Every structure is written in C-alpha cells, then in structure tokens.
From Swiss-Prot:
Species the sequence originates in: Haloferax gibbonsii
InterPro entries in alphabetical order: DUF7827 (IPR057149), GEVED (IPR045474), PGF_CTERM (IPR026371), Surf_glycop_sig_pep (IPR026452)
Chain segments annotated as coiled-coil in the UniProt record: none
Signal peptide interval: 1-22
Low complexity compositional bias, start-end: 782-802
Highest taxon of the lineage: Archaea
UniProt protein name: Cell surface glycoprotein
Length: 855
C-alpha cells in the first residue's frame, strides 16, 4: 500500500468512528425527554361517581406530561381511556378521575412526556398499577353516647365521609344540637345526657360519591374516663375510655394479683372512644394504657340491684306489685312488664325513685292472661335485672253486660250501646243474627279502665266497618265480621235486634236494640244579631238561653238567620257524609220567596256549606243551618242555580223554608216535608218619643223599639244642644230585648231646668239608620211614699246595670250605666301679662328702633 493510500485508509477509518460516536450522542439526547417513573396514590379506589387518584410522574420536563388508565392493557393511549395532562415539569402530580363505568379490576396507569396526547401515544418507562374495586359505601363502625363535659354521640365510619343528614333521636324527637365532621369521625352534641335508648339516623357520602343511609342503635356509656382519677362504674354499665386521637391502641388489665384479666384492643378507625363493658367483669380496679402512654383506671363495683315480685301467680283482675332496691339511694329505676317474647307490654311502664335507703315499691296495672317477666333498669348506668316468670290467669268471674236492657233509636241514627266490663277489659258484642239478615261481631277494649265502653253503631251505613266507633278515644274496638243481605248504601230496617256480650268466649248477657221508623217533624226560624258567631252546638244553645237567638217570623235584613230542622234518623247520614253531599240525594232545604210580585219567578236562596254554617246536634235530632242574609244570593229558578242571574235579598221579601227528606234517598219511602215562613223587614230603630221630657234627677228613662234581632247592641247618646250650659254628653250601651224594645236610665240630677238635648240611638254593627229625638229637662217629680220608692228601685234594677257588658252573649238585658262627659264653657280671656297700653308702647318702640337703624 502506497503512502497516499495508507493515509486515505486512516482518514476513512477515523471518519467512521466519529460518525458512530456522534450518532450515539444524538440518540442519548432524545432519550432524556421521557417520563421515567409514575406513582399512583392511593393504589386502590372504590367505584363511584367521584372516584379519583393522584399520579406523580418524574420526567425530563421538556414537554407536557400525560397519564391515562390503560383499560385494554395494550401499552398505548386510546381515545376512550380516562386521562389527565399537566404542563411540563420535572415532577408533576396529576389528578386522574376514574369514571363510574370502569369495571372493577387491576389496571396499569401509564405515563408519557410529549407535546400532546393523541391516540397511539406509547407508554414510556413510567407506569404503576391501580385496583378499582366494586362500589362500597362507608361502613358504620360505632355510635357511643358519653359525657366528657359536653354530652355527645360519637359516630365512627370506616372511611372519610361527608354528612348529608345526622340525627340522634329517642325514637320520636331529634335531639341533635350540632354536628362536626373529621374524616370518618362525626360528633353530635346533645343538650343533656339521655339514659333512654337512642338511635342515630344518617345519610353520608364517601370520597367516591357512594351514599350510605341507615338507622343504628347508640351505645350508652355513662362513665367517662381519660386519666387515673377516682372513677367508679357499677357492674353491668359501659365505660367510655377516651383517647387523644383516633385509632389508638388500648390495653386493659385487672389491678389485683388474683385478677388475670387482660385485653388488647383499640378505639377503632375514626374513633377516639373505647367502650369497656363491665357486665360479667370481676369487681376490681381496671387499668387502661391508651396509646402506650396515657393512663386511666376505673373501679368496678356492684350496684346491688334487686327486684322482688310479691306474687308470681295472679289473675287479670290484679295488678303486679313488688319492690326494687340497690346499694345506692336517690336513683331512678324504670320498671316494665315483658311478654313471653321479651317485648315490652304497652301501658305497663313506670318509673320509681329509690329513697335514701335505696328502696322503692312499684305497682303495675293489670295485664291480659299470659306469662310475663318484670324488668328493672337503673336509668343512669343501664344496669338491668329481670324477675322470675309471673303467670297471669283470666279471672273466673269476669263478665260483660249492657247498661240498659233496651236501647231505643230511630232508623238512620247512631245507637249508643254501653257495655260494662267486670274482671276484664275486653268483650265481644254481637248485633242481630242471621234470621234478621244482619249480624255483626265487634270486640271492644276498655283501655281507660273505667269499666265500660260505649260502642257507637251507625244504622245509616250498617254494612261498612266504619259504621262502628267508640265514644272515648282511649277505648278501642275491632270489627271482627259483618254478615248481611242488605244492599250497599241502604239503612237497616226498623225492628228489634238482639244484642249479646261475651267475655272469655262465653255469652254473659243480652239486650235489645229497637230501631223505630224515623220522622221529619218541624222547621223553625230564629234570628240573631248581625255578626253573631254561631259555629258550635254550645254557641246556639247559649245564645237561646241568653235571648240572643230568638224564634221569629219577621227578621231584619242583614241579621243572622238560623233555620232549625227537627227530624229523627239523620244523625248517621251527617256522621258519614256532609251537608252538600247529602243535599239533593237524601234531602233538600229550599228557601223560596212567597211574594215575588207579578210576572216574576220566586227567588230561591243558595244555602250550602259555602254560604251557611251547618251545626248538627244528632243527639237531640236537631240541625241548625246558620246564614247571614248579606252573604247569600238568590236565583229565580226552581232550584238555586249559581250560573244564572243572581239577586240579593231585599226588604219586604217573604220566604218559605222547606226541608224535605227525599223518597229517592235511603231515609224515606215517600217525600217527607216540614216548613216555616218568615218575612224580611227593613232594619230600623225608633225612639218612643219625639221629645223626651225628663226631670233633673237620676234614673230618667230613654226607650225605643227596633226591628233588628234581639241581642243587638245599641249605643244611646244624650248630647246637650242649643244654649245649654254647661255642655254635657251621656252614653249607654243597651241590648234589644226579646220583645224588640230597648231602654236605658240616665242621670240628669246635675242639669238645669229647661236644658235641652238630643237623643241618638245607633246600632254598633249593622245597617239600621240612627234614630233621633229632642229632649228637655224639667222639674223632677217628688216621691211621696216608701212604696213608690221601692217600685222605682225595682224598675231601675230591670233596666240598668252599673257597667256596660263587653260581650252581648252574656245577657240580652244587660245595659251600661250612662257615662257623663262634662263640656267646658267657652269664656273670653286676655293674653296673660299683656294689656292694650303695653302693646301700643311696644309698637312705638319698634318703630323708633327702625327709624334709628335707617339713620
């Protein structure tokens, strides 16, 4: 080889080596821009609407960082795979949301560093695994009620939660005061310590969005310990050992050498409370090591709760008596009877307080035949003791009877069947029998222990179980069966129906229910003052007694009308339905004009529950329809039609009120009617004299008459007029009497002879115009004999009272003692301190001052 060729070969070899070296350098530079590691936290996640994990990625920092959940495990990014992107950084932490649609399983979380994330992007060296597990809402761990200075209930879950609802109740009332949440620990503060059984109802959501809803029992721990202070707990109660942090280890051991009790536990996740149950534990001092450092202890003692039942074999006529005692006095103990299933027997609960010696007696009400135990519970500690079995047998002499051997009622009414019970509180009543086409068996229970049950039987709807009821809400009834051939909706026929009462499965006594034919007896018209409040039966009868509701055939327009219907057999219909539903099907009340005038149809008033108040007094077979003439309208049609032209009731209209029980209904075979007529007059007041001449003495009468309803309150004013001096004003409140008159006595003893005045009478409520008259004061007539004086006093007592009556319903004859208001006379006077001369001097001085200023 020539020298030139050798040199050329060396140069070519050097060039090849340099090319390889340069390529290696270039390749190394490209590899630096890549994700090198990825870490997923947490590495397990529950499926849920808000599940997510954090992914920390180390990279070159030159490009954006991308992570994705490799659903198909192909090492590449697919467009449908969950992903997240962050800006370029050497270390980036990204939040990756896991959709609820992702199936449970193990997946790779892949990472890559590139300018963008597109389909086909390759997983680089960085990836980690993630377990997606099936949706699992937060689990309830515990709920403990204790008092560390603040009464509270700690509720612990197995993971962090958000509280949507958290209520602590005693079964009825929400006792929660406030709620605080720390991860999976929820503290509910209460206003006090509750010894009753508590429940917690919650609705919480975990971090994955899964919701848990439930109601759980609360454990009551009356003793709270957190240090080595002298803490005492009675055997059988719970002790709350409270740590300074959640999920803290707790070691328990007996202090005595002969007590080898040891236990290792913890407060549990998201709880600071370790509950130590002393039930069955040796009486000893127990020491707690909390978190390896915190020390606490409690002395477990015997409460010595004892329960004694006086007699373990009694009858249904006897109460359960006994006594309870303990080693500590002034304690509250709850006593209750338990049936053979261990359930509390209703109405047997009682609470006793132990005296200073720790003793108390109890007496529970009688119970049905069966086997029972008595449970005593110390209210504060929850220590419970149960008695031996108490056997209760049915008293042999228990009987049922009827208060009356014959019960009379009308078809359609409600029969009151009074059942008396002796030696038992239950009995079965049979009404009728198969031969009568109707038979019903109803069991009654005397829950108020008065020895009787009043069974109500609605003969208007005998086929329905709702046709039975009891008069006292404390008593109970059960319809066992009804056997009948009566078509639906029809009443029982008139006749005699056998009654039978049985206790213990055997018939004790019998009686007879006599259903008589019903009748439509009468209609009467009454009137009351404008605005009278008549809504209940008592209101009507009180108004009649006080003469504020009077029977009439003439009433003033604007006053209240009361139509009284007397008819038997309607009580059951009114109990089962209402006036509007019954009108047109069972009966009609028509108030029709009798004087419409020539070429005009009669007015028919629209009487219904909207325009009238219906008051049913079924016990007395009386029904009141109350309406105000100002509130009802009328149509000139055969029956009231609110779609036709409507008219008002006018003065001088006359009406006939007719109540008809319809033959097409269930209460009568033929139409039965009763009616009453009344006239509407102008509301007027009239004074008895055009000019009243009174004496200058007391007890001078002012009187008049009125067409408005008796009981209407009037105001009478006596006002001085003309040149009368001094001026005066006298007023009195009076009420229209049953005969349409009114009067009041006034005192004119301070007035002068020939003083003149004006009298005005006006209604306090209504449309009647005022009545006026003149008056003059004359010389008083002297009383010459004692007899005359006595007569005057009696007359005064019947016409006046010392004070006005605030409520007109108290008495229709009450009047108010007139009140006199003196009117001051008008007199002339000069301005104090100034005369004419002084005023002139002041004017001159002012003028001079003005001139001086001008100069």
């Amino acid at each position: 080889m020539t020298a030139n060729k050798q040199v050329r070969a060396v140069l070519l070899a050097a060039l090849m080596v340099f090319s390889v070296f340069a390529g290696s350098i270039a390749f190394t530079g490209t590899a630096a821009a890549a994700a090198t590691s990825a870490t997923v936290s947490p590495d397990t996640v529950d499926k849920g609407p808000s599940a997510s994990v954090d992914v920390t990625v180390n990279s070159g920092g030159a490009n954006d960082v991308h992570v994705w959940l490799d659903l198909n495990d192909d090492g590449y990014y697919n467009a449908s795979e969950p992903n997240s992107t962050d800006t370029a950084a050497a270390t980036a932490t990204l939040s990756l949301s896991i959709p609820e649609s992702v199936s449970a399983g193990e997946y790779n979380v892949s990472a890559a560093e590139s300018a963008s994330l597109t389909a086909g992007t390759t997983q680089q060296e960085a990836y980690d695994t993630l377990d997606v597990v099936a949706a699992n809402p937060a689990d309830f761990n515990s709920a403990t009620h204790f008092d560390d200075g603040t009464p509270k209930v700690e509720v612990a879950f197995d993971e962090a939660v958000t509280v949507n609802e958290m209520n602590v109740t005693d079964g009825e009332t929400n006792l929660s005061q406030s709620v605080s949440v720390s991860s999976g620990q929820v503290n509910v503060t209460l206003s006090q310590v509750y010894t009753d059984d508590l429940e917690v109802t919650y609705n919480v959501t975990d971090t994955s969005g899964n919701t848990a809803t439930a109601t759980e029992d609360v454990t009551f721990a009356p003793i709270y310990v957190a240090n080595e202070s002298n803490n005492t707990a009675y055997q059988g109660s719970n002790v709350a050992v409270v740590a300074s942090a959640v999920d803290t280890d707790v070691e328990v051991e007996g202090a005595d050498d002969d007590n080898n009790y040891q236990f290792s536990g913890s407060t549990g996740p998201n709880s600071q409370v370790f509950v130590f149950d002393t039930d069955g534990k040796t009486l000893d001092t127990y020491q707690f090591t909390v978190g390896g450092a915190q020390k606490a202890q409690v002395d477990v003692r015997d409460l010595g709760l004892e329960l004694t039942v006086d007699d373990l074999n009694i009858t249904t006529k006897d109460g359960i008596e006994g006594s309870v005692s303990a080693n500590a006095g002034d304690r509250t103990v709850d006593i209750v009877a338990l049936d053979d299933d261990g359930d509390e027997v209703e109405d047997t609960e009682t609470t006793v307080t132990l005296n200073g010696q720790g003793e108390a007696d109890f007496n529970l009400s009688s119970v049905d035949a069966g086997e029972y135990t008595i449970e005593a519970t110390d209210a504060f500690t929850g220590v419970t003791l149960e008695s031996d079995t108490v056997t209760v047998s049915k008293a042999k002499d228990s009987t049922g009877d009827f208060a009356s051997s014959v019960i009379n009622e009308q078809v359609g009414d409600v029969a009151e069947i009074t059942v008396t019970l002796d030696g038992t509180d239950t009995g079965t009543v049979t009404i009728g029998d198969y031969s009568l086409g109707y038979s019903a068996n109803v069991t009654v229970e005397d829950d108020n222990d008065d020895g009787e049950v009043v069974l109500l039987f609605n003969s208007y709807a005998p086929k329905k179980t709702s046709s039975f009821d009891v008069d006292d809400s404390d008593d109970e009834y059960t319809v066992e069966d009804i056997t009948t051939d009566i078509p639906s909706g029809e009443t029982l026929d008139a006749g005699d129906y056998d009654l039978e009462v049985a206790t213990g499965g055997e018939a004790d006594n019998v009686a007879t229910l006599v259903l008589e034919d019903r009748s439509t007896d009468s209609v009467a018209t009454w009137t009351a003052p404008t605005g009278a409040d008549l809504t209940e039966t008592e209101d009507v009868y009180d108004a009649i007694e006080n003469e504020n509701l009077t029977q009439t055939d003439s009433l003033a327009n604007g006053d209240v009308v009361v139509t009284q219907v007397s008819a038997t057999g309607l009580e059951g219909a009114f109990d089962a339905s209402n006036f509007d539903a019954l009108s047109g099907t069972q009966f009609n009340l028509t108030v029709e004009q009798t004087n419409p005038g020539p070429n005009r149809d009669a007015k028919v008033l629209g009487i219904n529950s909207s325009s009238a108040t219906i008051i049913a007094d079924g016990d007395n077979d009386t029904y009141f329809i109350v309406y105000d003439l100002d509130d009802v309208s009328a149509s000139r049609t055969d029956y009231y039609d609110n779609t036709s032209t409507l008219y008002e009731v006018e003065d001088d209209d006359a009406f006939n009120a007719t109540f008809t029980v319809l033959e097409d209904g269930d209460l009568a075979e033929d139409d039965e009617s009763a009616s009453d007529e009344f006239e509407v007059v102008t509301p007027e007041l009239e004074l008895d004299q055009d000019e009243f001449a009174v004496g200058n003495a007391a007890e001078q009468s002012i009187s008049g008459t009125a067409t408005v309803a008796p009981g209407t309150e009037l105001t009478i004013r006596v006002t001085s007029d003309g040149d009368t001096q001094p001026r005066f004003l006298k007023t009195a409140s009076v009420y229209v009497q049953a005969d349409g008159t009114f009067s009041s006595a006034f005192d004119f003893s301070e007035q002068n002879l020939n003083d003149t005045f004006e009298v005005t009478a006006s209604v306090d409520s209504g449309t009647a115009d005022d009545a006026t008259a003149d008056g003059i004061v004359g010389e008083a007539m002297e009383t010459t004999t004692a007899a005359e004086t006595t007569t005057t006093e009696e007359s005064t007592e019947t016409t006046t009272t010392e004070e006005s009556t605030e409520e007109p319903t108290e008495t229709a004859t009450a009047t108010e003692e007139p009140t006199e208001e003196a009117t001051e006379e008008t007199t002339e006077s000069s301005t104090p301190g100034f005369g004419v001369v002084v005023a002139l001097v002041a004017l001159v001085a002012a003028a001079l001052l003005a001139v001086r200023r001008d100069n």
